Amino acid sequence: MKIYSWGSGNLGQLGIGNTDDSVSTPTLVLPPDGKKDYEIVNDIVGGGCHSMMIIDNGDLYTFGSNDSGQLGINSNEQQQQQQQQQQQQQQQQQQQQQQQQYQTIPTILNYFKINSIKIKNCSGGWAHSLACDNNGNIYSWGSNSHGQLGIDTTCSLNSTLSTSNNKNNNNNNNNNNNNNNNNNNNNNNNNNNNNNSGGVIKKKIVLKKKKVERKNLNEPKLIEILFNNKIRIVSVSCGMRHSIALSSENDVYGWGCNKFGQLSNLIDGNSLKSNNNNNNINDIADPMVQDSPKLINFKNEIKIIQISCGFQHTLLLDINFKNVLSFGQNKFGQLGNGNFIDQSNPCVIDISSFILPTSTSKSLNDIKIKEIQCGWSNSCLLTNQDKLYICGRGEYGILGDNRDLSLDNSNSNQFKLLNSESFNENKIKNFSIGSEHILIQVYSNDNNNNNNNNNNIYSFGWNEHYQLGLCEPIIIGKDGDNKSFPQLLPSIKGNDKSLVKAGGGNSFFILP
């Protein structure tokens, strides 16, 4: 099995051993053990500037940026790897500082290996990571700036009352150069206070805002509240700074940033029992943040089968594969509900509102959604007819509607069919949306496999870092040209088991 990557690699997130900012040609990602090929790779996912790869035996590899600990490799392991990688003392000293911030090759996450934990699926946010093991336990690590790890890492929480005689006292403390003027003002104010209150100086109460400081984690840690409540998780998804998990009971749990309603307004604060009496203290300090997992309570009216997080929005698919629920930021219409208003109340979108039956379907009842995915500001649905529908941001050409990008940057607040001649005689086998670009592998309708387009790979959208893989010559200082229409990748072709995977500003291809 071979792995290819291309696009942005300035922090090693391509896994090809360097920090090239732009790679336009699909390049082999060599196994870290020196072997020629990988045995079996189950999945590759991309975060903001880091990547994660799951091997068939359950091992997890990470590479790319580690500025917040999102690779899950602690400092001792890093130092050992740095010493092995460097041959000269001067190079070693330089690289020790750099390698603490990134890894350029896939590096096994020893925490799971040592503890015999087998990883089933994973997801990367802007600077945090989640992984789910075969037993339904979730582990998190990296940035916890907005509670996105689901673990209380608070190291200080200050809430005090202070008093001052008048508003000039604060100025006295802050402006040493104006002490004389402030003292005169203080005297005048004190005289006024004495005249107005019979000689009693009134004290002004100043409430200092609660300050919550959360530590990052540079090593995976079990989210105990889910484990203690015997919640078995089957899949996870990371947004920029929020996290969503799906349980084996088809319930959804969310935590982290909720500024735009990306956790919804159905968060049930009493859904999980905690051994920590102060479990909700941070949630009270900042209502925009949920530090621990909470049930998104649909009151048994809706059960969910798939989850996906965008940058600041969330998409869910119901267990009947018929309805999509969306909530969170909607600045670009990424919720697909017909407007551009942020929504904390989940919008239920019936596919009958935008999907029409084709000659292969007798009625609308035959059509179902088999996969949902979110980009940063877009949402995608793939139907059982192998048709792709996209909504959200129109800039960079990610809607694939062949618009003139110099004239039209309009957004779409409704799901629209990706209509391309490339797909008229072919169906979409698999697809992946990254931050602002999409990769698609097609297969032929020709049962005899006489179609030369079978297993071709296409890409469109944002191409600043040449993540579309079109093999263009790279000119230093010049960005790649964005594409609003599916482009054929000239250097690679898939097979019946290959997969495309899009990351933040990069792309991967798994070729068995």
UniProtKB/Swiss-Prot annotation:
Query: What's the superkingdom here?
Result: Eukaryota
Disulphide connectivity of cysteines? none
Per the record, where are the segments of Polar residues compositional bias?
Answer: 66-77
- Record key words, sorted: Repeat
InterPro entries from the xrefs? Answer: RCC1/BLIP-II (IPR009091), Reg_chr_condens (IPR000408), Ub_ligase/GEF_domain (IPR051210)
Q: Where is the composition biased (Low complexity)?
A: 162-196
Q: Where does the record place its RCC1 repeats?
A: 1-56, 58-134, 135-185, 197-248, 249-319, 321-384, 386-443, 454-512
Q: Where is this region: Disordered?
A: 66-85, 162-200
Pfam families recorded for this chain?
RCC1 (PF00415), RCC1_2 (PF13540), WD40_RLD (PF25390)
What this protein is called in its record is RCC1 domain-containing protein DDB_G0279253
Q: Which organism is it from?
A: Dictyostelium discoideum
